[in-house]
């Protein structure tokens, strides 16, 4: 399925997951100010890397394991206005994070990670890879972020709220710490079902993490003012 934003176009037909609201919210929210080198882990169609390119002057590295998704990602990058600043690496983040040239290299890391920790795999193999943590566990993801993030760098993620307890347990065993948490409610009056996470490699932080909420739609189904403000540079009809 093709998806057109204000400044770029995505063809995600061959990718594991279609363009999602999760990805758009994460890509619009991640604080990229002053970032010079950005890493998009599990790039899929390339949407996060392209959003980062629109919002910054950084050089962006997209890493994608699946061959079919990587082909689509490269196509989308090539058709964008920022092809000269975005580089695709096909392979695993586990391998890339062990490469000496990438250790401590990135100012910002962005990732919409696999979120099904247990349960049956999706029937379509690419979709299964994109949705299940079998290919990239939270533990492996945090280890890769630790390896690749520069001193005082930042990492932005989006997770299902039900995964937060396990994620926090693993986070406590890493060198990463919370900077900010945003609980996302899909509709006003509903419970939060996603969480935006901002992490850093800074140690012994004395400032408490910032905690807030974001509601995507009001009770009539229309985008909230906060959602419009966040995504209006991307969605065509906003």
Curated annotation (Swiss-Prot):
EC number: 2.1.1.223
Record keyword rRNA processing present: no
Broad class of enzyme this protein falls into: transferase
Disulfide bonds: none
Gene3D superfamilies: Vaccinia Virus protein VP39
Reaction catalyzed: adenosine(37) in tRNA1(Val) + S-adenosyl-L-methionine = N(6)-methyladenosine(37) in tRNA1(Val) + S-adenosyl-L-homocysteine + H(+)
Subcellular location(s) of the protein: Cytoplasm
Main localisation: cytoplasm
Keyword Ligase in annotation: no
GO BP annotation list: methylation; tRNA processing
Keywords: Cytoplasm, Methyltransferase, S-adenosyl-L-methionine, Transferase, tRNA processing
Gene Ontology molecular function terms on file: nucleic acid binding; tRNA (adenine-N6)-methyltransferase activity
Cellular component GO terms held in the UniProt record: cytoplasm
Function summary: Specifically methylates the adenine in position 37 of tRNA(1)(Val) (anticodon cmo5UAC).
UniProt similarity note: Belongs to the methyltransferase superfamily. tRNA (adenine-N(6)-)-methyltransferase family.
HAMAP family given in the database record: tRNA_methyltr_YfiC
Protein name: tRNA1(Val) (adenine(37)-N6)-methyltransferase
